[in-house]
Amino acid sequence: MSFGGGRDHQFNRNNMGSTHGDFRGSRGSDRNSYNRGNDFRGGRSFGRGPSRDTRVDLVAPNWDEELPNLPVFEKNFYQEHPDVAQMSESEVIEFRKENEMTISGHDVPKPIRSFDEAGFPSYVLDEVKQEGFAKPTGIQCQGWPMALSGRDMIGVAATGSGKTLSYCLPGIVHINAQPLLSPGDGPIVLVLAPTRELAVQIQKECSKFGASSRIRNTCVYGGVPKSQQIRDLQRGVEILIATPGRLIDMLEIGKTNLKRVTYLVLDEADRMLDMGFEPQIRKIVDQIRPDRQTLMWSATWPKEVKQLASDYLHDPIQVQIGSLELSASHTITQIVEVLTDFEKRDRLAKHLETASQDQDSKIIIFASTKRTCDEITSYLRTEGWPALAIHGDKAQNERDWVLAEFRSGRSPIMVATDVAARGIDVKGINYVINYDMPGNIEDYVHRIGRTGRAGSTGTAISFFTEGNKSLGAALIKIMREAKQDIPEELRRYDRGQYGQHPRYGGGRGGRGFGGGRGGRGFGGRGDGGYGGGGYGGGRGGFGGNRSRDQGWRR
């Protein structure tokens, strides 16, 4: 079966917005496209949609009537490699056991063991090999054959397991087999993600691996003006990565449509449901033809996610990597210190002194509230530490700048609320410090999962107070499973008598550092950095930076 030919030549165009997209101009199509006059929001075509101030309620089409009028599309592109075909049943079982794979569903394809066995066309395979990966991750070994086969599928795997490429690369193959977009068409691939940070990270992967196919994408999320996102959508994109709320906005004001979507991805489905996006997800999915291919990815498998899968996936196959029990990576050293709120500041300073001995260290410090986040940052900057803050009250351009400074190592300490717990993929994070414990054990696992990724080692330090006692039993269970040393002070919380279920039990956050003075900045960089006292002063905003050879502190 053909993977589809190369895409028509297009000129490159830089995206000047904040989404880092790669837009290559609109293209005429020499392939057949179905009639775009019927826009399932009430008969109005995309080009003649409602005015910017007019919203149209999204109503699910009558698919029994609509589906027979839609064109048939290809979605099974999997060609089993001869070496995979020769694997015996016992070899398949042993490989899955070694990689901690649990499989469910019927006619599940055999796993692949190398990139060459995946069956990707050369234009995809070459991009992968250029990245220098040694071999596929466990979720990719089983996920690629499942996704390429056109089946609805569920992948349950921890953050950092390589799941983005598990659906991104098959999505590129899927796009290249479909008719080209015509003016007014919506995307072919839709990826829903819970946060803008995760959405932007997904977009970077799509841009990188879709470049050779000239596949266009954009990222749609809240917190920034709609204008650039609308322009991107109106030019036409094959891949749309979106947070549910902003996508609903775009659909209701007629700036895009989902008629062409035949490949739907729900990434971090558990997180989207935790954040209350279930009504928006259902409203969005109801707008998409039911014979699409749907891929659901999740780090956990609670009953709410199971119900969503039951409602929207048809005869799915599933791969689970690791135990269904919540667990932390064994490459992370977990250190828990039982103390009082008033002891936190001194302990934080001591750990930073240790971490800063490695000039290449990157550290994330998690706080429970935006206020505490800013207070920690202000204190650290006053003491000469190169710290910046990121949380939901920061403007998007400031958040992007902070992440860029952190990634580059120019500001190796980032203080964050849980907005950064998922979706931020920064390589080389050595330390995670939970200044405040999170509200539930899932967030603890996701927080510390920022370090120890892709086989590297990392350290997670957590400050545990009496106010966190409802997390004690669950925390000890996580540490025992990962074979970590449990301090005697923590063992007394190893009882199920504190009233709250560990999933929902939350301790109160720390009290912060009081007011704190504004950070002093860290000198001006010769390359035109944000020098001086910083943009945002005591709130940990755009401070200047010291060059790496000057060390971390003043």
Curated annotation (Swiss-Prot):
InterPro entries: DEAD/DEAH_box_helicase_dom (IPR011545), Helicase_ATP-bd (IPR014001), Helicase_C-like (IPR001650), P-loop_NTPase (IPR027417), RNA-helicase_DEAD-box_CS (IPR000629), RNA_helicase_DEAD_Q_motif (IPR014014). The keyword Membrane does not apply. Residues 144-319 form the Helicase ATP-binding domain. GO terms for molecular function: ATP binding; ATP hydrolysis activity; RNA binding; RNA helicase activity. GO terms for cellular component: cytoplasm; nucleus. Residues 504-544 have a biased composition (Gly residues). Disulfide bonds: none annotated. Its EC number is 3.6.4.13. A motif (Q motif) lies at residues 113-141. It is an enzyme of class 3 (hydrolase). PANTHER family: ATP-DEPENDENT RNA HELICASE DBP3 (PTHR47958). The Q motif is unique to and characteristic of the DEAD box family of RNA helicases and controls ATP binding and hydrolysis. This is ATP-dependent RNA helicase DBP2. It comes from Kluyveromyces lactis (strain ATCC 8585 / CBS 2359 / DSM 70799 / NBRC 1267 / NRRL Y-1140 / WM37). The gene is DBP2.
